[in-house]
Structure formats: structure tokens, C-alpha cells
């Protein structure tokens, strides 16, 4: 079954990506809701498909379904995180641009163990929490989603429905770049190409005795 929550959509078709000879699947609206669904026959494995969307104003748009991708955080990562032994958690949580199956996008992850729902909202989806609801990975408290088409420079926040029923927007605690105050949005950034120039300082730090030096 393919399901997609698409507010303001008039029609949706699931289009096979890697097997163009297969027929497209028209998704039907469920009642009066914004949910569309359709059945893929004889598909028991991971299935790559685009959503061809016709919006209410007649505009057409085609994109990969965010939920057609596997989680970008492994079970081992979650195991180490829950034990408190994940030493590079900043590489897992936050926002990280990447390419998956030839699709450019950004993987988002945040720890919100008491949340009822978490969505990533930003200028790429009209700040509408209905477009990119995230999925909780097991009982870890980590919510994750890969958002196709969201790239470097996109502004975003996490929209969280708390256990008390309050809907709040939060800045990413693992964000790499931010708007200038008083604005508070995080900005998707790629720091993999940053050239560090502190080799001399690192070497001197390793050679020095910290107990014999001033604290600052």
C-alpha cells in the first residue's frame, strides 16, 4: 500500500522510478481527508516511486516520496545513542544534506522522546507541518526523515506536538547554521568542505601539561 498525506492536492499518481515499464498507480482520496492511497500489486520489497501531484490550482509537481526511503540512522547508531556511547551523535542528529538513490535532499533527525508528533517545517514546504511528518525510530525517542529536494540554504524548524498537546516550533539543537537574531530558524548547511587551520594549536595542546597551565 502506498499512502501520502498531501494537503491541497487534487490528484496523485505513483510513478515507478527504476521500472518505467510498470504501470502507474492512481492514488484515491480517503474520504474527505488529505490522505491518498493505492495498492501496488506483488511489491514486497523496497519500491522506488515518484509522486506525480496535481494541486488544486492545476499546477503539477513530481517528487520522490519521503517515506519511500529507509531511515538514515542505523539500529546500531540507536543502540549506542540509548546507551550513551555514541561519540559522534552530531553526525546523526540535526540536518545533513546527502544524495540517496540519485536523489538530492536532506536527512533530518531530532530526539524528542515525549512528543506525540514531530514534523520538519521550513521554506521548502510552506512551514506546514502536514507535509513532512517524521517517523519515530522504534522506542529510541529519535524522529527521522529524509526530505527530497531540500538542500543547502533551506530554512527549517522542528514542529513538535508535546505530550500535553501543545504545538511548538523548535530550533534544531544540532543545527550547523542559523538565522541572525531575533529570527530563530536553523539553516541547512554542509560543513564537510571546511578547511581547518588549527593543526599547530592541536599539536601544542597535546604536548602541553594542562595541570601546569592557566585555565584560560
Residue ranges of predicted features:
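The feature marks proteins involved in alpha-glucan
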Residues: 1, 20-22, 30-112, 137-216
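Short proline/glycine-enriched turn/loop motifs at strand-loop junctions of beta-rich domains
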Residues: 5-11, 111-118
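Active-site-flanking structural segment that lines cofactor/substrate pockets
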Residues: 10-14, 22-27
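Short beta-strand elements bearing conserved aromatic residues within extracellular beta-rich modules
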Residues: 12-14, 118-120, 156
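Short acidic, flexible loop segments centered on an aromatic residue
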Residues: 15-19, 122-124
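Short beta-strand and strand-turn-strand segments in soluble, beta-rich domains
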Residues: 21-22, 126-131
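Aromatic-rich, solvent-exposed beta-strand/loop patch
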Residues: 119-128, 208-216
Amino acid at each position: 500500500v502506498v499512502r501520502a498525506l498531501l494537503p491541497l492536492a487534487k490528484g496523485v499518481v505513483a510513478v515507478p522510478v527504476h521500472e518505467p515499464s510498470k504501470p502507474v498507480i492512481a492514488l484515491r482520496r480517503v474520504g474527505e481527508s488529505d490522505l491518498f492511497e493505492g495498492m501496488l500489486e506483488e511489491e514486497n520489497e523496497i519500491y522506488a516511486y515518484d509522486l506525480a501531484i496535481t494541486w488544486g490550482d492545476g499546477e503539477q509537481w513530481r517528487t520522490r516520496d519521503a517515506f519511500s526511503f529507509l531511515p538514515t540512522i542505523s539500529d546500531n547508531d540507536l543502540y549506542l545513542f540509548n546507551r550513551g556511547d555514541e561519540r559522534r551523535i552530531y553526525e546523526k542528529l540535526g540536518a545533513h544534506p546527502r544524495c540517496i538513490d540519485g536523489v538530492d535532499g536532506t536527512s533530518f533527525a531530532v530526539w524528542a522522546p515525549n512528543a506525540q508528533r514531530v514534523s520538519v517545517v521550513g521554506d521548502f514546504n510552506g512551514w506546514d507541518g502536514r507535509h513532512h511528518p517524521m517517523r519515530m525510530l522504534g522506542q529510541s525517542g529519535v524522529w527521522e526523515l529524509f526530505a527530497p529536494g531540500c538542500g543547502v540554504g533551506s530554512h527549517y524548524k522542528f514542529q513538535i506536538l508535546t505530550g500535553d498537546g501543545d504545538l511548538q516550533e523548535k530550533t534544531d539543537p544540532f543545527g550547523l547554521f542559523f538565522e541572525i537574531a531575533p529570527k530563530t530558524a536553523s539553516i541547512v548547511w554542509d560543513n564537510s568542505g571546511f578547511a581547518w587551520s588549527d593543526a599547530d594549536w592541536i599539536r601544542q595542546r597535546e604536548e602541553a601539561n594542562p595541570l601546569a597551565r592557566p585555565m584560560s
